């Protein structure tokens, strides 16, 4: 029994649309990675600030143990 090779590439091109033309530049850098750390330190700082924000919200809502030494006087 012989092996049959089937070409599964599409025979027709996709339909061109206005939205596709608008979104195409957003995908032009696909697969490219900038060398170095990039914005990783900035992301770390933002995550730390968000964690502090969550702890403050938790303290105000639940009188958390995390900030037990900090007095809140309203």
Curated annotation (Swiss-Prot):
<feature type="transmembrane region" description="Helical">
    <location>
        <begin position="41"/>
        <end position="61"/>
    </location>
</feature>
<comment type="similarity">
    <text>Belongs to the PsbH family.</text>
</comment>
<keyword id="KW-0604">Photosystem II</keyword>
<keyword id="KW-0597">Phosphoprotein</keyword>
<keyword id="KW-0602">Photosynthesis</keyword>
<keyword id="KW-0793">Thylakoid</keyword>
<dbReference type="Pfam" id="PF00737">
    <property type="entry name" value="PsbH"/>
</dbReference>
<feature type="modified residue" description="Phosphothreonine">
    <location>
        <position position="3"/>
    </location>
</feature>
<comment type="function">
    <text>One of the components of the core complex of photosystem II (PSII), required for its stability and/or assembly. PSII is a light-driven water:plastoquinone oxidoreductase that uses light energy to abstract electrons from H(2)O, generating O(2) and a proton gradient subsequently used for ATP formation. It consists of a core antenna complex that captures photons, and an electron transfer chain that converts photonic excitation into a charge separation.</text>
</comment>
<dbReference type="InterPro" id="IPR036863">
    <property type="entry name" value="PSII_PsbH_sf"/>
</dbReference>
<dbReference type="GO" id="GO:0050821">
    <property type="term" value="P:protein stabilization"/>
</dbReference>
<keyword id="KW-0150">Chloroplast</keyword>
<dbReference type="GO" id="GO:0015979">
    <property type="term" value="P:photosynthesis"/>
</dbReference>
<dbReference type="InterPro" id="IPR001056">
    <property type="entry name" value="PSII_PsbH"/>
</dbReference>
<comment type="subunit">
    <text>PSII is composed of 1 copy each of membrane proteins PsbA, PsbB, PsbC, PsbD, PsbE, PsbF, PsbH, PsbI, PsbJ, PsbK, PsbL, PsbM, PsbT, PsbX, PsbY, PsbZ, Psb30/Ycf12, at least 3 peripheral proteins of the oxygen-evolving complex and a large number of cofactors. It forms dimeric complexes.</text>
</comment>
<keyword id="KW-1133">Transmembrane helix</keyword>
<dbReference type="GO" id="GO:0009523">
    <property type="term" value="C:photosystem II"/>
</dbReference>
<dbReference type="GO" id="GO:0042301">
    <property type="term" value="F:phosphate ion binding"/>
</dbReference>
<keyword id="KW-0472">Membrane</keyword>
<keyword id="KW-0934">Plastid</keyword>
<keyword id="KW-0812">Transmembrane</keyword>
<dbReference type="GO" id="GO:0009535">
    <property type="term" value="C:chloroplast thylakoid membrane"/>
</dbReference>
<protein>
    <recommendedName>
        <fullName>Photosystem II reaction center protein H</fullName>
    </recommendedName>
</protein>
